Swiss-Prot record:
A Pfam family: TPP_enzyme_M_2
Similarity field: Belongs to the TPP enzyme family. MenD subfamily.
Co-factor: note: Binds 1 thiamine pyrophosphate per subunit.
Substrates-to-products reaction catalysed: isochorismate + 2-oxoglutarate + H(+) = 5-enolpyruvoyl-6-hydroxy-2-succinyl-cyclohex-3-ene-1-carboxylate + CO2
Disulfide-bond pairs as recorded: none
Pathway(s) annotated for this protein in UniProt: Quinol/quinone metabolism; 1,4-dihydroxy-2-naphthoate biosynthesis; 1,4-dihydroxy-2-naphthoate from chorismate: step 2/7; Quinol/quinone metabolism; menaquinone biosynthesis
Quaternary structure and partners: Homodimer.
Function description: Catalyzes the thiamine diphosphate-dependent decarboxylation of 2-oxoglutarate and the subsequent addition of the resulting succinic semialdehyde-thiamine pyrophosphate anion to isochorismate to yield 2-succinyl-5-enolpyruvyl-6-hydroxy-3-cyclohexene-1-carboxylate (SEPHCHC).
Keywords associated with the record: Magnesium, Manganese, Menaquinone biosynthesis, Metal-binding, Thiamine pyrophosphate, Transferase
Protein name, entry field: 2-succinyl-5-enolpyruvyl-6-hydroxy-3-cyclohexene-1-carboxylate synthase
Broad class of enzyme this protein falls into: transferase
GO biological process, one term: menaquinone biosynthetic process
GO molecular function annotation: 2-succinyl-5-enolpyruvyl-6-hydroxy-3-cyclohexene-1-carboxylic-acid synthase activity; magnesium ion binding; manganese ion binding; thiamine pyrophosphate binding
């Protein structure tokens, strides 16, 4: 007699494949044997083995970012599942679709002291969109139909907007090994068992017309763009800006700063000049239209938060509530194309001259001043991003670590015509799991990835480097090593000289060349920008791990950074007579 696990779990895995899932990230373990073996045996599913569960969770996250569809994440019972938690949280807040399948002991072995058995019910709390504890395997037609329906529902829940993680806890009795000779994927197969149809999110036309009529009469407006995924959405936003003659304040994750599209209306230096009160007042808008999550820039956030006279319109197709300013806003839950068409219908075509030109003037002057800063100083981290955007291979991706790297990208990354994409984990903004996320992204895009990361974040996720060795992933790591938490040097904590280094600076003194040796990668530590280019360009699109370490100084960079921006402010205000 065939073990019921074979056709029950086989049908489960098969329905995921029929529903469009192509990838499963699997962590080794005994209780998850049927899930792992049958996923590996399925002809339409690619299995990615990750030994460490925390790393695996973030690898799946990066893979799902690349695929823009759900990815399965499989582990055994016990604390293995708990190690997925940070990645599940990030997936929740960044709206990335994951299907977490945790194997479990059968009901009779729960809460009785059985080994490797913990309470896995609602393990991820409110950070998953859907949770269920599946029934124990049975082979009768009703149960095979049930488990297929459950798989289809999981894919639907993870993929519908707002996308996010779902969790199915799968109790399994021994024997755990399925019979691969028993045609495990064919029972109850009748095409796709569950089909879900979705469409473009629209909005009440009367309400939308009222909002767009208000915008049509606005002369001083701007568009703010956070992270954006689709090319069509980018083009719609550019078309809207051209129609309204509003500047676009483009976060680096919007990918509006790079690519072949027209960038005449793109403002890329706003993080620098919005720190000055006089410049802010001169550029103060009456209305702001925002797409995507709140951008990285703190000066922009504070401006929108603290000026109640700025009317805010937040367009969010997913129907979420992404407004940390809490300054009051019009929440518009519709697809950007619907919003664009409504504005087009209400637009009068009259716009005063001078408003857009003001933004362009300030932006160009600030960008010119930042470009004129010394390019020879290897200790100035801002130069990394100015160099990198001209060196990164066309069609590749840059994954940016949190803390200082993403902020420096925001400040120093210029608009230009080369085609690549910029990614980061900005859901919960943690420094953990960044290496593994970049690895998953690289595997998903099948194109080179350059990871820019600080030393503490790199240390957090050294385990993630194993994927580069095992899979031959073309990952180049630009390691910004200031021996500690560089961001704290910009914060008030730095004034406490007694406790700062111990509690916040946290130097490690690690020699990272050994990490390259451990994981079979190359390592260089250039001392000039020419040496940096010579180290980066030949390796950037080659398979395997390549670490380029840039040693910088936390203390001196703070003053250099401040002096640079203050000098730019003085020059622009003098020229503008502010």
């Amino acid at each position: 007699m065939t073990n019921p696990i074979t056709h029950y779990i086989g049908s489960f895995i098969d329905e995921f494949a029929l529903s469009g899932v192509t990838d499963a990230v699997v962590c080794p373990g005994s209780r998850s044997t049927p899930l792992a073996v049958l996923a590996a045996a399925h002809p339409d599913i690619q299995v990615h083995i990750q030994i460490d569960e925390r790393s695996a969770g973030f690898f799946a996250l990066g893979l799902a970012k690349a695929r823009q569809r759900p990815v399965m994440l499989i582990c055994t019972s016990g604390t293995a599942a708990a190690n997925f938690y940070p990645a599940v949280i990030e997936a929740h807040y960044s709206r990335v679709p994951l299907i977490v399948l945790t194997a479990d002991r059968p009901h009779e072995l729960r809460e009785v002291g059985a080994p490797q058995a913990i309470n896995q019910h609602f393990l991820f709390g409110n950070f998953v969109k859907f949770f269920t504890d599946s029934a124990l395997p049975e082979e009768n037609p009703q149960m095979l139909s049930y488990i297929r329906t459950l798989a289809g529902r999981a894919v639907s829940e993870a993929g519908k907007r707002p996308m996010g993680p779902v969790h199915i806890n799968v109790p399994l009795r021994e024997p755990l090994m399925p019979d691969l000779s028993a045609a495990p994927f064919e029972r109850m197969r009748k095409g796709r068992h569950v089909s879900v149809t979705t469409g473009i999110q629209s909005a009440d036309q009367d309400s939308l017309c009222h909002i767009t009529e208000r915008l049509a009469g606005t002369e001083r407006g701007m568009i703010v763009c956070g992270e954006i995924h689709g090319e069509a959405e980018k083009q719609q936003i550019i078309a809207l800006a051209e129609m309204l003659q509003f500047p676009i304040l483009a976060d680096p994750l919007s990918n509006l700063r790079n690519g072949k599209h027209d960038k005449t209306l793109i403002i890329d230096a706003y993080d620098s000049f919005l720190k000055d009160e006089a410049i802010k007042e001169a550029l103060r808008p009456d209305a702001v239209i925002r797409f995507g999550p709140m951008p990285v820039s703190k000066p922009l956030f504070l401006w929108l938060r603290d000026d109640p006279a700025i009317e805010q319109f937040i367009v969010d197709e997913d129907g979420g509530w992404r407004d940390p300013t809490q300054a009051g806003a019009h929440m518009i839950h519709c697809h950007p194309s619907v919003f664009l068409e409504a504005v087009r219908s209400a637009e009068t075509g009259k716009r005063p001259s001078g408003w857009l030109e003001k933004w362009q003037f300030v932006n160009e002057r600030f960008r010119s001043h930042l470009q004129a800063a010394s390019m020879d100083d290897l200790s100035f981290e801002g130069n990394v991003y100015r160099q990198l955007q001209h060196l990164v291979p066309e069609g590749s991706s840059i994954f940016v670590g949190n803390s200082m790297p993403i902020r420096d990208v925001d400040t120093f990354f210029e608009k230009q015509d080369r085609s690549f994409r910029v990614y980061a984990n900005r859901g919960a903004n943690g420094i953990d799991g960044v290496v593994s996320s970049a690895m998953g992204l690289c595997e998903g895009t099948k194109a080179p990835v350059t990871l820019v990361i600080g030393d503490l974040s790199f240390y957090h996720d050294l385990n993630g480097l194993l994927a580069a060795k095992k899979l031959g992933i073309p990952l180049t790591v630009i390691l910004i090593n200031n021996d500690g938490g560089g961001i704290f040097s910009f914060l008030p904590q730095a004034s406490d000289k007694t406790h700062f280094e111990e509690l916040f600076g946290t130097p490690t003194g690690l020699d990272f060349r050994h990490a390259a040796a451990l994981y079979g990668g190359t390592y260089t530590c250039p001392e000039t920008w020419e040496a940096f280019k010579d180290a980066y360009q030949p390796q950037a699109d080659k398979p395997g791990l390549h670490i380029i370490e840039l040693k910088t100084d936390r203390t001196s960079r703070v003053q250099f950074h401040r002096d640079l921006l203050q000098a730019a402010v003085r020059e622009v205000k003098k020229e503008w007579k502010l």
